């Protein structure tokens, strides 16, 4: 994320040359990351909802929940900027419940890109949101020709389980098996 904003606050944050998150414009807004269920403020590195209070008199917003899932980095930045850094991870609408966790597409993508068999030239995947609470994560993904899909699905499922802490069922299909989108890929689909 090079920069971020909203209509009432055009520049919420911007990245420095370190490219390690967006430094927040904390002199223009109060930025909080909260637990979406409890409303409790979260600390360094914890994932939660982005809530903003804009301090400008003409565009005042009080604890506006942008429904973005983010985390804050409160460690000093090598660039010398003193404001905290924000990392955008996804949208609340893309959270998929699996066991006692909520998984975002970025969580799955980071694992898939460890497997060239599914990520070259790019990973095409979907996370299936269950109609009822489920103990496992269901991921559909395309694979390159010439691989053993059963063995590869097991390896990816094991890695997802190890990284995300929930069992995963991986459904592999040949390239071209998932729909393509002109604008933004639908990474989360309902069962």
Please provide the spans of the model-predicted regions.
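Active-site glycine/GP-rich loop and adjacent strand/helix microenvironment
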Residues: 1-191
């Amino acid at each position: 994320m090079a920069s971020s904003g909203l209509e009432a606050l055009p520049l919420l944050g911007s990245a420095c040359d370190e490219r390690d998150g967006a430094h927040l414009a904390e002199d223009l807004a109060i930025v909080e990351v909260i637990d979406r269920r409890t409303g409790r403020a979260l600390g360094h590195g914890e994932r939660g909802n982005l809530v903003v209070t804009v301090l400008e008199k003409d565009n005042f917003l009080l604890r506006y929940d942008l429904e973005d899932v983010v985390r804050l980095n409160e460690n000093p930045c090598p660039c010398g900027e003193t404001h905290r850094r924000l990392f955008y991870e996804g949208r609340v609408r893309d959270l998929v419940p699996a066991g006692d966790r909520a998984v975002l597409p970025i969580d799955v993508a980071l694992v898939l890109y460890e497997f060239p068999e599914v990520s070259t030239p790019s990973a095409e995947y979907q996370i299936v949101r269950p109609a009822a609470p489920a103990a496992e994560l269901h991921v559909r993904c395309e694979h390159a020709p010439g691989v053993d899909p059963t063995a590869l699905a097991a390896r990816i499922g094991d890695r997802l389980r190890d990284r995300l802490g929930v069992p995963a069922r991986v459904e592999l299909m040949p390239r071209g098996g998932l729909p393509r989108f002109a604008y933004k890929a639908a990474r989360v689909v309902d069962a």
